[in-house]
Amino acid sequence: MKKLFVISTLAVRLIALVALTSCGGKDNSGYKELIAGKWVVKSYYHWYHDFTDESLSSERSYTLSDTNYIGYDSAEFNTNGTMRWHMNDRYVSSGMFSDPYINFEWRIKGDSLFVSPNWVADNIAKYAIKELNSETLVIEQHLDNEHPEYSHHHWEQIHRYTFSRCKK
């Protein structure tokens, strides 16, 4: 169960990162160049509301100083549609994964985003770019369980990531 939670959490992060290139149907070519390169998570905000069991609801924020959670995640985007994600090494040392790196492919077709491998149903997540410039990237991902597969448990959550561009 813990491994499934970690995989789904990583998938949420990865899909959120990849979704940055899709900006509401606008021309995405400029975003590919601006996003290209290596980014590291500077802070992370998570809000979760469980309508089925209120006691499970939570809200928390982490910054780079919280070394047990933030400061290890990084992603490198290439304009050719590939991305390399570096996970926290503790997942590897715990035996959950054999390699801290996961390679992904992404592409945009119209307003739709496609990710491979696809671990989380794209139709339960909505993405928004809150800030994007040469040094900072802020994205917000909103998920809810309106998908029929999840109708037995009603929940909603927001993930907000603030990234800093890695210095060369």
Feature map (PLM): residue ranges:
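Sec-dependent bacterial lipoprotein signal peptides
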Residues: 1-22
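Lipid interaction determinants
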Residues: 23-168
